[in-house]
Amino acid sequence: MPGTSELITVAVPKGRLLQESSALFERALGVSPRKLLEGTRKLAADAPEAGLRFISIRAGDVASYVEHGAAEVGIVGLDVLREEPRDLYEPLDLGIGRCTVIVARPKGARPLPRGVAPRVATKYLSLAARHFAAKGVPAEIIPLHGSIEVAPSLGLADTIVDITETGETLRANGLVIEEKVLEVSARLVVNRVALKLHPERLRLLIEALRAAVAAADAEAR
């Protein structure tokens, strides 16, 4: 059994992904990050029997923790990884947290006149800019961090780039999906230095999770 100082630190995002990833860890290793973290007011909890320490942090910060070595392993949405590319090893699609980054506009809105750059409200500044640039469309990107769906109705934007799971919030705000930008799911990411320092332990962790993902997929069919 590894000592406390030898535990592999796994950064897990708060919210829905914590619950979904906990089911995978429980299947793979018999430990649930959610149950461990619920039992403490701290943002870290140890599972020495599995050689792991779990830390619960904001989803958007997981990649930074892993890239800079504060955690060896993390769970990150593909949207985060493609919005701001990181120097991380991505060995596994966990198949959880499935969503889609989309372009949406008001239902029944008339097309903009040729040559007029659309005003695009989004938190995905890079993804949106790259998407419209690839189409040869000059776009004015308006950065927002919340309530993006109301931007068109308030006259702030002509269209939005946002992430959706069911599309219900879009429909409730009178928006229709125009294009899909990126299919998203959560990925396992690993610090590249840690991969050299703990190759065998990380290989076993990755393979255990890979088997858990495969089993979950088989059950879902």
UniProtKB/Swiss-Prot annotation:
Function: Catalyzes the condensation of ATP and 5-phosphoribose 1-diphosphate to form N'-(5'-phosphoribosyl)-ATP (PR-ATP). Has a crucial role in the pathway because the rate of histidine biosynthesis seems to be controlled primarily by regulation of HisG enzymatic activity.
A molecular function (GO) term: ATP phosphoribosyltransferase activity
Lineage: Bacteria, Pseudomonadati, Myxococcota, Myxococcia, Myxococcales
Assembly information from the UniProt record: Heteromultimer composed of HisG and HisZ subunits.
Keywords: Amino-acid biosynthesis, ATP-binding, Cytoplasm, Glycosyltransferase, Histidine biosynthesis, Nucleotide-binding, Transferase
Pathway: Amino-acid biosynthesis; L-histidine biosynthesis; L-histidine from 5-phospho-alpha-D-ribose 1-diphosphate: step 1/9
GO cellular component: cytoplasm
Entry domain remark: Lacks the C-terminal regulatory region which is replaced by HisZ.
Protein name: ATP phosphoribosyltransferase
Family of the protein in this entry: Belongs to the ATP phosphoribosyltransferase family. Short subfamily.
Localisation per UniProt entry: Cytoplasm
The keyword rRNA-binding is assigned to this record: no
Keyword ATP-binding on entry: yes
One of the GO biological process terms: L-histidine biosynthetic process
Reactions it catalyzes: 1-(5-phospho-beta-D-ribosyl)-ATP + diphosphate = 5-phospho-alpha-D-ribose 1-diphosphate + ATP
EC number of the protein: 2.4.2.17
Class of this enzyme: transferase
